[in-house]
UniProtKB/Swiss-Prot annotation:
The WSXWS motif appears to be necessary for proper protein folding and thereby efficient intracellular transport and cell-surface receptor binding. The box 1 motif is required for JAK interaction and/or activation. GO terms for cellular component: cell surface; endosome lumen; external side of plasma membrane; extracellular region; plasma membrane; receptor complex. The chain crosses the membrane at residues 235-258. A motif (Box 1 motif) lies at residues 267-275. InterPro entries: FN3_dom (IPR003961), FN3_sf (IPR036116), Growth/epo_recpt_lig-bind (IPR015152), Ig-like_fold (IPR013783), Long_hematopoietin_rcpt_CS (IPR003528), Type-I_Cytokine_Rcpt (IPR050379). A motif (WSXWS motif) lies at residues 215-219. Homodimer upon hormone binding. Interacts with SMARCA1. Interacts with GH1. Interacts with CSH. Interacts with NEK3 and VAV2 and this interaction is prolactin-dependent. This is Prolactin receptor. Keywords: Disease variant, Disulfide bond, Glycoprotein, Membrane, Metal-binding, Receptor, Repeat, Secreted, Signal, Transmembrane, Transmembrane helix, Zinc. The lineage of its organism: Eukaryota, Metazoa, Chordata, Craniata, Vertebrata.
Length: 622
């Protein structure tokens, strides 16, 4: 029994469902909220699209709640916004609040709900289109003709309080055209359009938009007919010409400023100044300084050469006593029938350079041409009258005119040049002491004694201290005795003059034995040959004062100082005298004669020390 009741119930339900499906009755479809709009931020309206009704009458309702609330509210006004809409008045609208809303559809078969929508009134503002749009063509006398457009803002928006800010946009087109010409007007409610085609009919519309929101709908179109006599002056050409002219002017000004020329200089060029004769501007541009300087008369750069061959290597400084001796010698020879020839003084070295080729040639050639005539190494004396020849005093020349000897007494044979007031004092320069000594020792070949670098074993040179009267007789006997033993190759002896340091004592001869590698000289006293009898050491004639080589200065100048060990040197001299003369001794005596004769002339007194001028050695050895 129970089984029969259950099966009957199932059958009834299946029959009911079949009947409903055959009649088309279903639950409603899902609705959709598609738009919410606020015209003035005070009220807003939302619209939705309903779904299928299922063949049955369907009711729609909108429910919402504000963010942060749980209480649900239903739409306050379904009529103001039209069908399927909900309008929120001022009392239901709140700024800066978010609304969460949805739509519910219900019929006999069931119900359905839309998706939730979040709405902020600030961002859903869309004003109404502008009102009272007016269009007019104006042709002022002093201006170009134009199309004047004017409109009014929507009435629902309060612009006076500043609650709203609207932006406007205008569009127009000829009636038969397809595209619109859009112009942005900003916040103003008037606008002028200049580019129009005469004789055509235009459509004009306007719309507005708040600062935060959407553009409104376009206002209704307004038509305007442009007259046929409406002449539009096209200013595009004139604007292009003006812009091009401005660019050209800027280029010209830039070029003038870049080159540094002024407008005044271009209009009124300056008067050219006088040109320097011989000055060529092209030489300056090409950079040839040598030709430019020669054109201006300036000296060019000095030529490069070996300055070691041109410059004087050493200098000799004469003090005032030398000038006094020169004046004395010139007074002693007032009229000898001889005219001295002076060399041009060298302003750089202080005395005429001994390296002058002309001076050396004159020194070497003149003694060979006339052996009986004495020529000074620095001054060449020539007779004014060729028939009248100058001869030296008989006391000064001996040994048949081969070896002239000059003593300090009596008539002096001066070799000093006469002073010239308009020139510098003629001076001689030092030569390298090594070259001088090689010239002296090379041909002689005499045995030498080596000097060490420290100067400890410096050899001595002797000086015989005699009176002026005894010196004359002794020198005469020495010349006569020396003439008997020497051959034709005996070199000349230079005159024994008064030394610059004022010593009236004649000096004895010294002998050059050897030259060290450092340029040091080995000196020995010369053997007396005037008599074969040795003299006692106690006699006045044998009282000799020796000098030793103290050292060589930076300028290769020998420094001679008096030797306190006179006894040792005297013994050395006596042993030298006892040695028999030989060929080597004879050759050494030749070199000694040249060295001794020039030593008295070439010495200078400086601070109590005696100097030897090697320049004089060269002249005597030649």
């Amino acid at each position: 029994m129970k089984e029969n009741v259950a099966s009957a119930t199932v059958f009834t339900l299946l029959l009911f469902l079949n009947t409903c499906l055959l009649n088309g009755q279903l639950p409603p479809g899902k609705p959709e909220i598609f738009k919410c709009r606020s015209p003035n931020k005070e009220t807003f309206t939302c619209w939705w699209r309903p779904g299928t009704d299922g063949g049955l009458p369907t009711n729609y309702s909108l429910t919402y709640h504000r963010e942060g609330e749980t209480l649900m509210h239903e739409c306050p006004d379904y009529i103001t916004g039209g069908p399927n809409s909900c309008h929120f008045g001022k009392q239901y609208t709140s700024m800066w609040r978010t609304y969460i809303m949805m739509v519910n559809a219900t019929n006999q078969m069931g119900s359905s709900f839309s998706d939730e929508l979040y709405v902020d009134v600030t961002y859903i503002v869309q004003p109404d289109p502008p009102l009272e749009l007016a269009v007019e063509v104006k042709q002022p006398e002093d201006r170009k003709p134009y199309l004047w457009i004017k409109w009014s803002p929507p009435t629902l928006i309060d612009l006076k309080t500043g609650w709203f800010t609207l932006l406007y946009e205008i569009r127009l087109k000829p009636e038969k055209a397809a595209e619109w010409e859009i112009h942005f007007a900003g916040q103003q409610t008037e606008f002028k359009i200049l580019s129009l085609h005469p004789g055509q009919k235009y459509l004009v519309q306007v719309r507005c938009k708040p600062d935060h929101g959407y553009w409104s709908a376009w206002s209704p179109a307004t038509f305007i007919q442009i007259p046929s006599d409406f002449t539009m002056n096209d200013t595009t050409v004139w604007i292009s010409v003006a812009v091009l002219s401005a660019v050209i002017c800027l280029i010209i000004v830039w070029a003038v400023a870049l080159k540094g020329y002024s407008m005044v200089t271009c209009i009124f060029p300056p008067v050219p100044g006088p040109k320097i004769k011989g000055f060529d501007a092209h030489l300056l541009e090409k950079g040839k300084s040598e030709e430019l300087l020669s054109a201006l008369g300036c000296q060019d750069f000095p030529p490069t050469s070996d300055y070691e061959d041109l410059l004087v290597e050493y200098l000799e400084v004469d003090d005032s006593e030398d000038q006094h001796l020169m004046s004395v010698h010139s007074k002693e020879h007032p009229s000898q029938g001889m005219k001295p020839t002076y060399l041009d003084p060298d302003t750089d070295s202080g005395r005429g350079s001994c390296d002058s080729p002309s001076l050396l040639s004159e020194k070497c050639e003149e003694p060979q041409a006339n052996p009986s005539t004495f020529y000074d190494p620095e001054v060449i004396e020539k007779p004014e009258n060729p028939e009248t020849t100058h001869t030296w005093d008989p006391q000064c020349i001996s040994m048949e005119g081969k070896i002239p000897y000059f003593h300090a007494g009596g008539s002096k044979c001066s070799t000093w040049p006469l002073p010239q007031p308009s020139q510098h004092n003629p001076r001689s320069s030092y030569h390298n002491i090594t070259d001088v000594c090689e010239l002296a020792v090379g041909p002689a070949g005499a045995p030498a004694t080596l000097l060490n670098e420290a100067g400890k074993d410096a050899l001595k040179s002797s000086q015989t201290i005699k009176s002026r009267e005894e010196g004359k007789a002794t020198q005469q006997r020495e010349v006569e005795s020396f003439h008997s033993e020497t051959d034709q190759d005996t070199p000349w002896l230079l005159p024994q003059e008064k030394t610059p340091f004022g010593s009236a004592k004649p000096l004895d001869y010294v002998e050059i034995h050897k030259v060290n590698k450092d340029g040091a000289l080995s000196l020995l006293p010369k053997q007396r040959e005037n008599s074969g009898k040795p003299k006692k050491p106690g006699t006045p004639e044998n009282n000799k004062e020796y000098a030793k080589v103290s050292g060589v200065m930076d300028n290769n100048i020998l420094v001679l100082v008096p030797d306190p060990h006179a006894k040792n040197v005297a013994c050395f001299e006596e042993s030298a005298k006892e040695a028999p003369p030989s060929l080597e001794q004879n050759q050494a005596e030749k070199a000694l004669a040249n060295f001794t004769a020039t030593s008295s002339k070439c010495r200078l007194q400086l601070g109590g020390l005696d100097y030897l001028d090697p320049a004089c050695f060269t002249h005597s050895f030649h």
